Regions:
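Extracellular beta-sheet/turn segments enriched in Thr/Pro/Gly and aliphatic residues
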Residues: 95-136
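Bacterial signal peptide processing site
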Residues: 22-24
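C-terminal motif of bacterial Sec signal peptides marking the signal peptidase cleavage site
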Residues: 17-20
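Asparagine-centered strand-capping/turn motif at beta-strand->loop junctions
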Residues: 32-43
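Short, hydrophobic/aromatic beta-strand segments
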Residues: 45-49, 96-97
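Tryptophan-paired
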Residues: 49-90
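Bacterial N-terminal signal peptides that target proteins for export
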Residues: 1-9
Length: 136
């Protein structure tokens, strides 16, 4: 009889552990595009965004003032890789800087996002994610 009580107790504990626990996977940001916006008053040239680890890159030769250059790509989960951005100003100055592209704290995991590099002037930029207006 004591064996059955112990068995019953252990069985109940096992059920509580198995069915009482919940998997907590954090949602991932899905990225399917990149855009270089030029809000500066001069042309930005030879823009190149490089993933440091793999040396893969995306580039755009010329972005006129108040316009953009963008591309789409197959959707991928954002993994926070180290990125480096380089570009040339209309005066010929070549600038290279690391990019801090943070995943938003709140986002809709059912939507696809585009990474945005927005030049605020010829020598500075902001980097962020926005919902991809063309999520195909």
């Amino acid at each position: 009889m004591l064996f059955y009580k112990r068995f019953y107790f252990m069985f109940c504990c096992l059920l509580i552990v198995l069915f009482g626990c919940k998997s907590t996977t954090s949602p991932t940001l899905t990225v399917s595009g990149l855009a270089f916006y030029n809000d500066a008053n001069s042309t930005i040239e030879n823009i190149k965004l490089t993933v440091v680890e793999s040396a893969k890159m995306v580039s755009c030769n010329l972005v006129e003032p108040q316009s953009y250059c963008g591309t789409g790509f197959p959707q991928a989960r954002y993994q926070g890789a180290d990125l480096v951005l380089s570009w040339q100003t209309s005066q010929g100055q070549i600038i290279t800087r690391p990019v801090l592209l943070k995943q938003p704290q709140k986002f809709d995991a059912s939507k696809r996002y585009a990474a945005v590099i927005k030049f605020t002037d010829p020598t500075n930029f902001e980097a962020f994610f926005t919902v991809n207006p063309r999520p195909f």
